[in-house]
């Protein structure tokens, strides 16, 4: 079972309520940085397996 659009909308609404409009851009920025670091780490892991 994947996430449907309604599930994603509910999660975003909960995040908005918890953090408020003022902190939301900072939270999204931190989340994006974390995802980028995770992807970079996965790429490094793949390159070490090939060696």
Curated annotation (Swiss-Prot):
Q: What is its main location?
A: membrane
Listed A to Z, the keywords are: Cell inner membrane, Cell membrane, Membrane, Protein transport, Translocation, Transmembrane, Transmembrane helix, Transport
How the protein sits in the membrane? Single-pass membrane protein
Which GO cellular component terms, listed alphabetically, does the Swiss-Prot or TrEMBL entry include? TAT protein transport complex
Q: Does the keyword Nucleus apply?
A: no
The residues forming the signal peptide are: none
Q: Subcellular location, in the record's words? A: Cell inner membrane
Entries under Pfam families matching the protein: TatA_B_E
One GO molecular function term of this record is:
protein transmembrane transporter activity
Locate the transmembrane regions by residue number.
Answer: 1-21
Q: Which GO terms describe its biological process?
A: protein transport by the Tat complex
* Similarity comment text for this entry: Belongs to the TatA/E family.
Subunit and partners: The Tat system comprises two distinct complexes: a TatABC complex, containing multiple copies of TatA, TatB and TatC subunits, and a separate TatA complex, containing only TatA subunits. Substrates initially bind to the TatABC complex, which probably triggers association of the separate TatA complex to form the active translocon.
What function does this protein fulfil? Part of the twin-arginine translocation (Tat) system that transports large folded proteins containing a characteristic twin-arginine motif in their signal peptide across membranes. TatA could form the protein-conducting channel of the Tat system.
**Which HAMAP family is this protein grouped with?**
TatA_E
What protein does this entry describe? Sec-independent protein translocase protein TatA
Q: Which organism is it from?
A: Rickettsia bellii (strain RML369-C)
Identify the coding gene: tatA
